[in-house]
């Protein structure tokens, strides 16, 4: 009789604990819906804000599928068709370029650029040749080692 009484008391205590925990969970859930009463409501921002859509073509905030401005080439094409060519402006620009190229300072810079380009090409060719020679030496050395191994194996 005592064992059955102990078992029933333990079951009753377990049931009381389960009911209390269920009540506390319900109270927390009810408070969870009311964020103003939550103790961390001022500390943590509970609302998740989506980041704007970003890509390389349009930037951030809009997608490519949205209608946008016409391509730049259409604007340029229309401007060229509407405006007649100004030959005077074009000829002035060309004459300025010719005058600039005739100056000695520009000629000196052009010569320096060309000489640096030639030096760069010479360095590239020299490095290629050095690479070829090193590869050739490695191949010859590998062939000698292979021959020595074959001679050792044949003896």
From Swiss-Prot:
The modification Cysteine amide is found at residue 60. Keywords: Amidation, Cleavage on pair of basic residues, Disulfide bond, Hormone, Neuropeptide, Secreted, Signal. Transmembrane segments: none annotated. Residues 24-49, 64-155 form a propeptide. InterPro entries: CCAP. GO terms for molecular function: hormone activity; neuropeptide receptor binding. Central nervous system; most neurons exhibit coexpression with Burs. GO terms for biological process: neuropeptide signaling pathway; positive regulation of heart rate. The keyword Coiled coil does not apply. One of its GO terms (cellular component) is extracellular space. It is found in: Secreted. Disulfide bonds join 54-60. Residues 135-155 are annotated as: Disordered. Residues 1-23 form the signal peptide. Residues 141-155 have a biased composition (Basic and acidic residues). Cardioregulatory neurohormone that increases heart beat rate during adult wing inflation; has no effect on beat amplitude. The effect of CCAP is both ino- and chronotropic. This is Cardioactive peptide. It comes from Drosophila melanogaster.
């Amino acid at each position: 009789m005592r064992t059955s009484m102990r078992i029933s008391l333990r079951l009753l205590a377990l049931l009381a604990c389960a009911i209390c925990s269920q009540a506390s969970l319900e109270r927390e859930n009810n408070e969870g819906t009311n964020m103003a009463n939550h103790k961390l409501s001022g500390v943590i921002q509970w609302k998740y804000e989506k980041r704007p859509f970003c890509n390389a073509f349009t930037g951030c905030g809009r997608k490519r599928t949205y209608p946008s401005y016409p391509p730049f080439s259409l604007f340029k094409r229309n401007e060229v068709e509407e405006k007649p060519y100004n030959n005077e402006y074009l000829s002035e620009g060309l004459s300025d370029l010719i005058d600039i190229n005739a100056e000695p300072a520009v000629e000196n810079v052009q010569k320096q650029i060309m000489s640096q380009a030639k030096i760069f090409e010479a360095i590239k060719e020299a490095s290629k040749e050095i690479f070829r020679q090193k590869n050739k030496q490695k191949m010859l050395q590998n062939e000698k080692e292979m021959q020595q191994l074959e001679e050792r194996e044949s003896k």
